[in-house]
Amino acid sequence: NGEYMVARNGWVGDYSDPSNMLDLFCTGNGNNDGKFSNADFDAAMEKAASTMDTAERSAALHQAEDVLMEQVGCIPVAYYNDFWLQSEKITGIWHSAYGFWYFMYGDIAE
């Protein structure tokens, strides 16, 4: 029912854009589990979504992020990273933006 003081949540970015994380905090977003709602934030996100100008879009996303941080809509504490070593002899293996490894395409060069 949303009646709690703090919760831990996680999200893995599936595409490389700030809106991937910021959209989660828009009023009414189905993944807005904390029920954050702020008119200034929503307006900045709407502006970012409605412009084709890259600089204007970037400024609107920065504004939305500023509002989110000022209102403590979330407290980022961690970012997932993967680290690995791979021999130059191994080819064809790739890692998707979703975090999946595709070993089935791998080969070992002699």
What are these regions (language model features)?
Residues 1-2, 20-50, 79-110:
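Short, solvent-exposed loop/beta-turn-alpha elements that line the ligand-binding surface or hinge
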Residues 7-10, 52-88:
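Bilobed periplasmic-binding protein-like "clamshell/Venus-flytrap" ligand-binding domains
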Residues 9-19:
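Short charge-dense sequence patches
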Residues 15, 34-42, 54-61:
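Solvent-exposed, acidic/flexible segments
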